Amino acid sequence: MAKTQFDEVSWSQTSTAKLLRSAQFVTSAANPKGYPEDKGIEVGFVGRSNVGKSTCLNALTQQRRLAHASKTPGRTQLINFFQLNEHVKLVDLPGYGYAKVPIAIKEQWAKNIEAYLAKRDALRGIVWLVDARRELVGEDLLLLEWLVSQNIETRLLLSKTDKLSRNQAQQALHRLNKQLELLNVPTKLVSTQVYSSVSKEGIEVLTQRLALWFSVPTELEDDLSNKVTQSPTEIENDEVL
């Protein structure tokens, strides 16, 4: 994975939270021809259909309708780009794993996701949502193997932990970490945490991770910080999709 052309300057958690609130939709693309220019910093969001990617993006940015969650799993086939400022974007990749989607469409999705992950120089890291009630299987394991082989930093979020007790959520996190250990996955490359869009558990921890991935030229840091404004929109307890 090629490095961004920018010198690295860490954002504080507070600055990152403000930056996230400035998110705006840029474009949707079905293939690389429709992507924005490959520059700056991008963080991609992946996960199975109906795991809650859109809800996670909305919670992070404190915008209830920034990312639209489809009521029909497997409906979203496009890659969606959201601009935080002129240098930083969030990227919502199509959900995978929905059984009722035709094989031809599944294969096309896989090609589109792989094309983005393999060839996007701006990609700094991946936020991967997995259901806390499920183990990594099938397509999950294929994606994991591929991310590791491409040396892509990944934060695995155990989502929907609001459906579990605190003890059950911690047990699920332990099982996931044990599974990754047995698969010899480097902990410096793939890290894990619990997350809930309902209780907001894990939002601050995830924001800290994003702060490490969001870096800008030193000479632009103060200017960009001044341009970031707080959105008045507040997140409500939306249904976890």
Regions found by a protein language model. Give the residues of each.
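Conserved G1/Walker A P-loop phosphate-binding module
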Residues: 2-100, 216, 220-222, 226-241
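Conserved C-terminal guanine-recognition region of P-loop GTPase G domains, centered on the G4
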Residues: 114-189
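Switch II of P-loop NTPase G domains
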Residues: 35-38, 73-80, 94-124, 132-146
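Short, glycine/charged-enriched secondary-structure capping and boundary segments
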Residues: 39-40, 60, 103-106, 141-145, ...
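Conserved nucleotide-binding/hydrolysis micro-motifs of P-loop NTPases
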Residues: 30, 75, 88, 95-97, ...
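Residue-level signal for inorganic ion chemistry
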Residues: 82, 159, 206
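Helical mechanochemical/support elements of P-loop NTPase systems and associated helical scaffolds
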Residues: 65, 78, 89, 105, ...
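Canonical P-loop GTPase G-domain recognition
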Residues: 20-32, 163-223
